[in-house]
Amino acid sequence: MSTIEGTAPAGSSTAGRPAPAPARSTLRKRIFGSGEKPGFLTYGLLLAFLLSSAYPLWWSAVIGSRSNEALGETWPPLLPGGNFWTNVGEVFDTIPFWLALGNSVLISCIITVSVVGFSTLAGYAFAKLRFKGRNGLMLMVVATMAIPTQLGIIPLFMVMRTLGWTGEIGAVVVPTLVTAFGVFFMRQYLVDVIPDELIESARMDGASMISTFRHVAIPAARPAMAILGLFTFMTAWTDFLWPLLVLDAGNPTLQTALSQLQSARYVDYSVVLAGAVLATLPLLVLFVLAGKQLISGIMQGAVKG
């Protein structure tokens, strides 16, 4: 028997050829993304978030480089003017800027080093050491986070006055040498990042408790220490109420000194915002220098989660 083989007409599709992807699906992937590749919408939202976050600082710099009359214009200015250094000179003439800057740097650095050091020690103890009452003590630490800071200002001020510390830098530093949030944050990080087997192995090799903490816990906790350090420095740098209560007007921090630029009858907002821009620059420099550690810590936390 002979078989008759037919040929498909020209222009007809073969049975095994895959159908082309729909154009609608391709457009959806470009907009919303697919898998690990973000889409246009993701980039658009990130850009909008970036602009909304950077605009207040940019607007402060614009008004700080102009006169006070710029606030009354119908359309707010978007480009800097030429009065920035004039306003900066007014800031230097009105407040003890360099003294306030030195106080803020000193206070923020001492508080940051103390909080990071004590929090890492306490967090490691709560996470990896077994001792009686550990869970109860940790519960007390967490419970203090629910108490508003303003509730303890009056009793704390009375203690500082009894000790004779009012007007001194120590009155600002001592109450914040360690924080409940720092202890809780480091404990939650170290409880997952350091395996118990690694600590037992170090003990079997003859390492002491201090040596284990130094060579095992600290290297593993560096990303979290960087994040806690940045957060603590920023909190100490921007603190206003407590330094205002315990420090004299002649020995201020940068935030309390900026409040001296305002008077009861007239406020030159261009001078105030010029001072605010100067006070923000150290934080921006810190974030630029420590940005790599910050991103590393966030990424490690995301991978563990």
Where do the model's predicted regions map?
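Short, Lys/Arg-rich, polar N-terminal cytosolic tail immediately upstream
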Residues: S2-S34
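A structural signal for multi-pass alpha-helical bundles of membrane permease subunits
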Residues: P38-G305
